[in-house]
Amino acid sequence: MSKYAKELNAIIIGAGPAGIAMAYRLKHELHFDDFTIYEKLDGVGGTWRTNTYPGCGCDLKSHLYSFSFNMNPNWSKELCEQPEILQYMEDTCSEFDLHKHIHTSVECMGARWHTDISKWEVNLKDLQTGIEYSRYASVLVSAVGAISFPQDVKFSGMEKFKGHMFHTARWDYGVDYKDKRIAVIGNGCSAAQVVPAVAKHAALVKQYARSGQWFHARPNKQYSETERFMFRWIFLDADEETTTYFPTPKGLKARAEAEAESKKYIKSVAPKKYWDHIIPNFPLGCKRRIFDPGYLESLNLSNVELLPEGIKEITETGIISSSGIEDDFDIIVLATGFQVSQFLTPMHIVGSTGISLHDQWKQCRGAQAYLGTHVHNFPNLAILFGPNTFPANNSALFACETQVDYAIKSLFTPLIDHKAAVIEVKQSAEDRETNAIHKSLRDTVFSGDCSNWYIGDYGRNAASWPGLARSFWFKTYFPDWSAFNMSGGSALWPLLTIRRWLSTMSPISTVFALVSLAAAVSRYRGLVEGVAIVGYLETALRAGISIVSKFAQ
């Protein structure tokens, strides 16, 4: 590693799936060790440590929820629960020696770019001691995820309620819900998992849901030992299902078939009195569809009730619905979603112009980033799971690994190779790409007539990627260097790049590469025998390798 690379360091915020993937790539593929991950929770796992409510699990096939560098053939079933997924995240960190880079129970309060020293000053708080301090880094990576901070809902009278009230992501396990009257507000994936889970023990579960959802049968067979032995690869069949969200003849046909299938399933399981309330009046895909975890069946229970209304007021003892129906409850569960479109909440990030990231996004009328990763005026910053990177119906791990790969190519390798010391995307490139994305989203169901978490405060969809998951991979595979402003660096960067390539290869591959290079030079020499430039090339090559070797010591 070059002297300059040794001076580089990075801070990663978040030890969820994206942070783990970034740490692996830096440590084991770039052989770059000078990075630290700060995680506000007491361990790794991100959303799978945050969300521990009863019934919490994955709504995507488990084998699609595996890191490419740590394939897991041992998932117990098609859609696993939270404890098994969290254990997989912890095992991954242990297997690849990542824990030593991770500081838990430390929250990032914000960061500021210092142009004079080309460093980020990152403000941190130890949540165990309350001590606040700062650390400096050449590169700042946000891997905070999107399903961590609960939606900040405000209902009239919330402060009056004398029972227990909490969000699904802040589940209070100190509260015993056995034989209690429970209200569940919301009708997304979390609510669909919570209702059947708590209904087994509660005296009453009453759900408040203003609109319907597209439900599908949940394929969740238990895998045998033989099947687990046979699983070795991740297949991307689910990517094709995303076509149901596009305004193409194929997409419209697939969507109609999926909606018909969903209606048939709902009517076969849910009580007839709820059909009109459950079946949506918006197209499939406008909200994230739900693979039924037993929710529809639970509506047949005598202690479960669905009220298709909103909340007028919360009283000292319960809830008054929008039509005036009043009920008393012991517990109110807020299954009201997350601040998905409020990226990097609640950190205060200040860029090179002295303007905070959230203020800049207000001026842009919504969060935006070049290919979801880079933001103008914020040098040496990478956002993982940034604006418009969410896959419609594919693995979040595939999406975050794709973005990690792009951040490595577009930011870390140029800095390590000393191609530049500071890298910042051009505003023109960011605006051009953002406009193209929103134009593509315009006619998709993501922008349909429903209330969903894709749409931000300014009416823009700042979450969804408009194409197939693999199209984002194609789009980001080769960085477009014309989109960036670069400063600093060294004239030796091509030689440093060669040196890095060789240092990351196996001994056999290194020998093969050197022999191939020598053979190419010799062949070129034979073709232009007598031309002095060949000798210069050979001399320069030998001298370059010698210089790089000394520079790297």
Stretch-by-stretch model annotation:
Residues 2-10, 15, 20-158, 174, ...:
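N-terminal FAD-binding dinucleotide-binding subdomain shared by FAD-dependent oxidases/monooxygenases
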Residues 170-181:
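A compositional/structural signature marking long, glycine- and acidic/polar-rich segments
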Residues 181-202:
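Rossmann-like NAD(P)H-binding beta-loop-alpha module
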